[in-house]
Amino acid sequence: MRYKLAHYVGSITVFSLFLVVTLTAFGQKMTTLETEQRLSDLGYWITKVDGKRDDSTRQAIIAFQKIEGRKRTGVLSASDIERLRTATRPVAKFASGPAHVEVDISRQVLLYVGDDGIVQKIVSVSTGNEQKYFDDNQWQVAHTTRGNFKVQWKYNGIRKASLGDLYYPSYFNGGIAVHGSPSIPPYAASHGCVRVPLFADKALFKMMPVGMPVNVYDRQ
């Protein structure tokens, strides 16, 4: 039995047939498989290039939209598709030195940079939202401090905390860590930690040994 579904998002018609999605807008077309392959080629974190849209597909699109300064929807518009076809791999702010992690607060992305200075992985994150919150019997501000740090210690598993569960956290500034979370909106929303999607938390945990540099900055 075959099923063909169609719905409209703005000026984009999305056809879904056997988990293969074609995005069509003003003559621009790109299947889910093509989208995943192109994003993966540019370094955006795709768990598996298989033509099946999942959370990594959506988050990779959002990361691409963040990097390119576009509307963060998780769905490719016609102009997004056009840009994706010609885009280049993002460039690290700190291209020299050993392998490291960069957290770009302005664009809400994490870049994993290899020993050669080339960005190997880009994943969407959510950092401190600068709002006040009450914890440990005091008011605090949800701020992710900018600066150059190193991974200090790690917790191999899910760490229970008063503000929520931290999945495979790598602490780099006191109680601030890069950790997995089921909630990664396309904007800053954390209490100060760097949230990453659950599909990337275990891999990042292994990729970030104690002592690895973590550079947190606002992009100029």
Where do the language-model regions lie?
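A structural motif detector for short, solvent-exposed N-terminal "entry" segments of globular domains
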Residues: 88-131
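Bacterial N-terminal signal peptides that target proteins for export
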Residues: 2-13
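Extracytoplasmic/secreted envelope proteins and their assembly/folding machinery
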Residues: 32, 36, 58, 62, ...
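Second-shell loop/turn segments in exported
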Residues: 45-51, 69-72, 96-99, 137, ...
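Short acidic, glycine/serine/threonine-rich helix-capping segments at coil-helix boundaries
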Residues: 28-34, 40-84
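Exported/periplasmic cell-wall-interacting domains
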Residues: 29, 94, 142-146, 153-220
